[in-house]
């Protein structure tokens, strides 16, 4: 990956959250783009990475959705006077990356106890599920951005996606009064190339070849003693003499030319 593509991939994390499709739509679009490569058993870089993220997102998404469903079901049995656990007592995504997976439950339980030692058990389970679902959602957000990048590189080409990310970031960073109303689209960037390839008109008949006919030489003139004399006349070969005819006499010579009969 060249340096421009590497920068564009890093800039994907800075794009607005609502720029990317929803998880279900994203996975469906990615599968449609990957289907031809799966049939041919392609081992291209973007195919392998996009396939990995499709599987990862599907598993994480189903698990996260299940956590939310169980947490919502527990709301009915939580005592109505229970105070929800504040966000500051729930483990965040950055903190979870530093904690071993086996110790995640213990760390979260210690925080809930520090908030309220006799916290109801159903409310504790609800707090755990909400914390884990939040961590999964942030991991899914990073994964879906990478999946979007790799399967769009298969659809449009890595160079076009790199160019598109650069233009989009420029548009987003420009004040609204100085930029266009609509954000640039990758279709608009690639459209001129497609039109140029498919819009050429073919002419009927044979085309006259160029460069096969000799060029006509332009006659240059020079001024000699006030008269214009053509260079073509100077370069003209002398006319051949007929046998027996006298040779032309030079104006500077005073002698007769010898007769060819002698």
From Swiss-Prot:
Function noted in UniProt: Self assembles to form an icosahedral capsid. Most capsid appear to be large particles with an icosahedral symmetry of T=4 and consist of 240 copies of capsid protein, though a fraction forms smaller T=3 particles consisting of 180 capsid proteins. Entering capsid are transported along microtubules to the nucleus. Phosphorylation of the capsid is thought to induce exposure of nuclear localization signal in the C-terminal portion of the capsid protein that allows binding to the nuclear pore complex via the importin (karyopherin-) alpha and beta.
Disordered as annotated region, ranges: 183-262
Motif (Bipartite nuclear localization signal): 215-233
The keyword DNA-binding belongs to this UniProt entry's keyword annotation: yes
Keywords noted in UniProt: Capsid protein, Cytoplasmic inwards viral transport, DNA-binding, Host cytoplasm, Host-virus interaction, Microtubular inwards viral transport, Phosphoprotein, RNA-binding, T=4 icosahedral capsid protein, Viral penetration into host nucleus, Virion, Virus entry into host cell
Name of the protein in question: Capsid protein
Modification Phosphoserine occurs at: 232, 245
Quaternary structure annotation from Swiss-Prot or TrEMBL: Homodimerizes, then multimerizes.
SUPFAM superfamilies per the UniProt record, alphabetical: Hepatitis B viral capsid (hbcag)
Residue ranges with Basic residues bias: 215-234, 252-262
Annotated organism of origin: Duck hepatitis B virus (strain Germany/DHBV-3)
RNA binding as annotated region, ranges: 254-260
Signal peptide start and end residues: none
GO cellular component: host cell; host cell cytoplasm; T=4 icosahedral viral capsid
């Amino acid at each position: 990956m060249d340096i421009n593509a590497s920068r564009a991939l890093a800039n994907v994390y800075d794009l607005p959250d609502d720029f990317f499709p929803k998880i279900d739509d994203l996975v469906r679009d990615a599968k449609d783009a990957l289907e031809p490569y799966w049939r041919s058993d392609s081992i291209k870089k973007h195919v392998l990475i996009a396939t990995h993220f499709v599987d990862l997102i599907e598993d994480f998404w189903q698990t996260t959705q299940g956590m939310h469903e169980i947490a919502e079901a527990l709301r009915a049995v939580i005592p109505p006077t229970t105070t929800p656990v504040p966000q500051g007592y729930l483990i965040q995504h950055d903190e979870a990356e530093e904690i071993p997976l086996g110790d995640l439950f213990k760390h979260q339980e210690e925080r809930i106890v520090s908030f309220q030692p006799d916290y109801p058990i159903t409310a504790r389970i609800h707090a755990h599920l909400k914390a884990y679902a939040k961590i999964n959602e942030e991991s899914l957000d990073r994964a879906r951005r990478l999946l979007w990048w790799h399967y769009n590189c298969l659809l449009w080409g890595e160079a076009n996606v790199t160019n598109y990310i650069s233009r989009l970031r420029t548009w987003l960073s420009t004040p609204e009064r100085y930029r266009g109303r609509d954000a640039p689209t990758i279709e608009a960037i690639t459209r001129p190339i497609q039109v140029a390839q498919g819009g050429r008109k073919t002419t009927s008949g044979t085309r006259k070849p160029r460069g096969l006919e000799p060029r006509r030489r332009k006659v240059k003139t020079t001024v000699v003693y006030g008269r214009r004399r053509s260079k073509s006349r100077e370069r003209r070969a002398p006319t051949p003499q007929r046998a027996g005819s006298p040779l032309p006499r030079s104006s500077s010579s005073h002698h007769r030319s010898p007769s060819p009969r002698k």
